[in-house]
Amino acid sequence: MPSQLDHLKTLEQRLLWLSAWTVHNANHLRDKRDDDVKVGGHQASCASMVSIMTALYFHTLRPEDRVAVKPHAAPVYHAMHYLMGNQTLEKLQNFRGYGGAQSYPSRTKDIDDVDFSTGSVGLGVAETAFASIVQDYLEAKPWAADRPLGRMVALVGDAELDEGNVYECLQEGWKHDLRNTWWIIDYNRQSLDGVVHEGLWEKVEDIFKAFGWRTVVLRHGALQREAFAEPGGETLKSWIQSCPNADYSALTYKGGAAWRARLMNDIGDQGDITALLDRRSDDELAALMNNLGGQCLQSLCDAFD
């Protein structure tokens, strides 16, 4: 019998396909005039959020919780609600068109159950913190004291952390003993406006800790952690953590044979690490190297629990 994790993986793949198709259809399949401009839609930003949103929505959330979905993950959000019967095929087909599903989740223009309107980029992040503060105010009132406290969750693109209002909000949260607030940062190191510099996550973590947040970093998935426990695993872990993002992305695209060649070239034949690699086919090696924390449903579910 399939496990809950198996069902989550099925949902993950369907969300990945449908969100990618929604953007592809808007740009390449539906009728357009010769002078129409490109529609856009951020397929990569969607792909990096699929596992996170699958674990969050289908494993973790309670009815009283509220979520601000990062703007560029709107196609994933619309795809998810389509699977649940809350969105129509016609609106997906007209994504980013007049009357279609919106570019960014919108409480006033979308028909799926949007908790927070999250355009412009960066605003949805701060909304969750102030919503939590308002929730604390209401809890102090006798007419709202029995309401269950919800978690205010922001799904944050790493490039959204360029927005100054995020840091103003962190300070306000510290002043008012912010609680029941999750900010889940999609650290995909991709930005249309610039480069997300290597090592930025450490600076971000320091800032959150300075304002009293409990930080959890999901760097490696379950497959990688299991491999690290094998002889030669620490060598592999060290290589992964020092590999530049540009190289890692290129190797992910090329696949298992490229991973094997690069690892052997960089590390050399060292017995244990060579045996670790030899125990895995090219496909298995690719799955291992792609099993980072943000793409591992098991790791995400465990962290959210």
Regions found by a protein language model. Give the residues of each.
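Gly-rich Lys/Arg/Thr-decorated short loops/hinges at beta-loop-alpha junctions or inter-strand turns
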Residues: M1-S3, P105-V114, P148-M152, W183-Q190, ...
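Cofactor-binding active-site loop characterized by glycine-rich and histidine/acidic residues
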Residues: S3, H7-L15, S19, V23-D31, ...
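Short internal beta-strands
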Residues: R66-K70, N180-N188
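Short glycine-/polar-rich loops that comprise or flank the Walker A/P-loop
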Residues: G150, D177-T181, G212
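Long, well-ordered, tryptophan-enriched scaffold segments
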Residues: Y187-D305
